[in-house]
Amino acid sequence: YYTVLFGVSRALGLPLERPK
């Protein structure tokens, strides 16, 4: 789940590193 969000955020180019 975390990996998916990380991949999506990275694909979108968002400054998200670790969602609370």
Curated annotation (Swiss-Prot):
It catalyses: oxaloacetate + acetyl-CoA + H2O = citrate + CoA + H(+). Pathway: Carbohydrate metabolism; tricarboxylic acid cycle; isocitrate from oxaloacetate: step 1/2. GO terms for biological process: tricarboxylic acid cycle. This is Citrate synthase. It is an enzyme of class 2 (transferase). Homodimer. Keywords: Transferase, Tricarboxylic acid cycle. GO terms for molecular function: citrate synthase activity. Belongs to the citrate synthase family. The keyword Transferase applies. It comes from Populus euphratica (Euphrates poplar). Its EC number is 2.3.3.16. Citrate synthase is found in nearly all cells capable of oxidative metabolism. The keyword Transmembrane helix does not apply.
